[in-house]
Structures are given as C-alpha cells and as structure tokens.
Amino acid sequence: MKNIFEKSNDVNGINFFNGEEKVDFIDEKFLRKGKIGLPQTSELEVLRHYKQLSDKNFCIEKGFYPLGSCTMKYNPKVNEMLANLEGFLNIHPHLKDEDVQGALELMYKLQEALKVVTGMDCVTLQPAAGAHGEFTGMMIVKKYFDSIGEDRKKVIIPDSAHGTNPASAKMAGFDSVEVKSNEKGQVDIEALKALLDKDVAAIMMTNPNTLGIFEENVLEISKLMHENGSLLYYDGANFNAIMGYTNPKLMGFDIVHLNLHKTFSTPHGGGGPGAGPVGVVDKLKDFLPVPVITFDGEKYHRNYNLANSIGNVKGYFGNFGVLIRAYAYILMMGKDLKQVSADAVLNANYIKEHLKNDFKIPYDEPCMHEFVLSGDLQKEKGISTLNMAKRLMDSDIHPPTIYFPLIVHEAMMIEPTESENKERLDEFINVMQKIAKEVQENPEIILSAPNSAPVKKIDETLAARKPDLNYRMEE
C-alpha cells in the first residue's frame, strides 16, 4: 500500500490563499521560503487512504487480544455515548465551580468509588496514566519523608516488576534496589530482609505480580516494611484480578495507583489517553496533588488547600473524558465487579491448564488473571517466542506480551480478560497447540510468518538502527 505522499498528484485538496497575502506578524526569518511539501490529494482519496489504514489496524472489536499486563477488555460503547453528552463535552476547565456541578459530582463520586474498591482514604484523579500515577506516588513518598526530616534514598523493586517502577522511582530522586523472586515466583522474604535498612523509603509491588501469581506473603512484607518505617506502594496494573475479594489497604499498602484504562474499561493503546488515579491512606492525604474534589453536603468544590501537596501533576483535572467512561463502567457493574475478577481468573487458568503440556510453565502455580509461558522448548528447535508471536497473527489473534517479565526466558505473557467466552478461548488454545505442533513438523511456516499480514517480514535490526521517520517529497 502506498503512503499518502506517494498518492500525491496535481489535484489540490484545499486552497490556503493565493500567496499574495502578507504575513507581517511573523518575523521574515521564520517564514518558509520553499514549498511546503504536503501531499496533494482530493478529500475522497484522503478518506479512502485512512479508511484502508484503519482496516489494517487490530483492535479488541476485531479479534482476541491477549496482551499480558494490559487488560485489553471490551470497552462498552454506551460509555462513549455518555462521554459525548453535550454537558460533558463542551464545558471549559476555567468555568467556576457553580457552573460545572455535574462534572464535579461525577469526579467526586468516582473518587468515592475508587476509595471503596481500593480501601484507601483519599484519592486524586489527576495522573494521566499508570506510570504517571507511579511517579505521583513516588513524589508523595519523597515529600512524606522530607516532612518528617528523613532523607531516605532507596526503593525496593521486585525483579519481576514492570519497567516503569524503577523509572518512576528514579525520576522522583530514589535509587532502585532489586529484590529477587523465590522458586514460586514471589518476593523472596529472606532476600527482602537482607535489603532492609533505614535508607529504604518504600517497596513497589504488583499483586498479583507480573507472573500472574498472588504474593501470598504480602502481609509479612507489609509488617517488615512498616517496622522499618518504610511505605508500601501498590502498582494497580493487575487490579482486574482481585476486585471484591481483597484490596490494597487490607494487604497493608499505603499508596496505590489504578489504571482506569485497564481495569475500568476505557479505550487504550497508541499512547493514550489513559488515567492513573492515586489513592493514599489517611496520613498521606495532605501530600496529594491539588485540586481534589470535595463535597460540603450541598455543593461540590475543587480544593486546593492541602498543606503538604506535591502540587499539580497534570493540567487542570486529569483526562476527564476517561474518568466519565470509567465511572459509567463502575455504575453498570456495581457489585458484579467481583464477578469480573472471578471470570478473568477463570479464563486465564483455563487456557494455562490446556497449554501446560505444549509449552514450558516456569512457575506452575495457580495463576490469577494472567500467566506466563516460556518458549524454551521451542527455542531448542530453532523457533523463538518472537517467531511464534508472528505466527499467531496468521490466525487473526494479537500476539501476547513477549520477553516480559525479564526473569522468564522466551516469555509469553497471556491475559484473556473476562470479556472472552469459552469458544474464543478454545480457538486460541487450538491455535497455540497447532503452532507447537508446527515447531516439530513444519518450522518453515513459522519462520516465514506472518504470512497473511499486510506487512510481511521486516528487517528489525535495520529499522531500529536506521529508522526512516519522515518523507521528503521531490521538488
């Protein structure tokens, strides 16, 4: 398929001006002297081009999307209708509180709902993504220890953690210290004890962790950290597994971020938008970003008066459109959020049990909402996890997350979510088993994959080292 520049012809899609108008409000040295170099196509051809591109995209509405740790669940379309209501769509952030009471009410009630599901005492909706929530949480940790006169420098992070955890800690001014996993894929308690000293500010954990395994010693970890004067940070990337069964507060965490674009069904991918609200226990509430939304019994307000606030972490009030969608999802599901987690865990275990004889399971424990396979057995035959991921594309299935977590060789992280029915799960199982068989009997078809995708084999090394990121039209 040609790119839009290659489709350019002598037809003008739009006439800007005849070139005689003078632009006297911009210094002449900043004005373009040559041609703009934009493609010239008709409106119809532009529409056709981008429609053809959209047809090549893969999305949850098009097929199975088992992208581990991303929770690619179905996003109900009624949420889109609600987010596009005129009263939400056309309001301006500079309007006074009395003019946006409906929007503030929604945000306040979303804060309250997130307090219920997490057990936290106070919530901010500002952060725009999970990693942004992590950074916000780490800034709160930093400000807390500054307020009590302690200059702690270390944050402990499990070796199975998301890569954003050490990055967020570093950005907030901490040094990350890795704690190893044990033979069950959980935090090694003895290794953790050896790392604890008065320079440790916090531990960042995901529970269930990125192996899809529940950290069964979390209460002991909480006790150890608190006895050391340290805080516990909960990465909510895998929160879809535990709703209604437990919450971060019960596990002993002090700070939590949630990914509304994962657990609470708002569309994501392609860089955003997202939302990563942060909740804290009572002793940390004054460190939250401002404003937080409050209710005095009659009216809703934006409260900027938090004594030790870390300040503003996002323009205005967060990604409001995402907040609307998430609140709608919570209202729709209600107490059935617990069933969401039950179904997500059931679906993951169903697939895992059917694939355990065809692929290596590095940690053969009952999993939660996702699990990790290893392609080590297939690698011995010359077929890598990357090869198998590309072969999945020939069956209109999005590849799972691969080569993560880093502690698993040839990793494939599979998360079906609660959205998929048994027929779809069986289809995926059959395709994976077929690929395992092809490794033995017909490896060439895997090595040539994807065979049905619009873009076939690419030179990944060349693309990484010499990316061609723009197009220069000929004069």
Predicted region positions:
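Conserved PLP-enzyme active-site core in the AAT-like
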Residues: 102-105, 132-298, 308, 382-383, ...
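Conserved phosphate/anionic-ligand binding catalytic regions in large, soluble enzymes, centered on
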Residues: 58-79, 126-134, 264-279, 317-328, ...
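General small-molecule cofactor/ligand-binding pocket signal
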Residues: 124, 177-179, 400
